[in-house]
Amino acid sequence: MPDSLSFAHSAERNALRRELRARRRALPAAARIAGADALATRLFALPFFPAKGYVAGYWAMDGEIGLHSWQLRLPPGLVYCLPVLADDETLRFAPWRPGDELVTNRYGIPEPDVDPRASLTATDM
């Protein structure tokens, strides 16, 4: 039987998620684009930002801040990866570029159309 405290916490968390999604959706497109550009600028300014290898991002959904501005400006030696959910719920990563095929996973999230076993683990990144 679920613990009543954890159930209350879960209900509060779900309510907060709904509220934040509504706030994100209410932002005008210009504000979302400006936010994405500002985030990209800040990411590139990080002192530990890599020049080569892999970086993981996400497919922005439901008002989340987009990473496209950042992804399109990555240095040539840096490969952008999106999460791929394996059948065992393990999160893996696969290289992705605009135009590459995407499929919708069981949660409705677009991910690269690859066999999850052929994708990268977090430690491979």
Labelled PLM ranges:
Residues P2-T121:
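N-terminal active-site beta-alpha-beta segment that forms phosphate/nucleotide-binding
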Residues T123-M125:
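Short SAM/SAH-binding signature in class I
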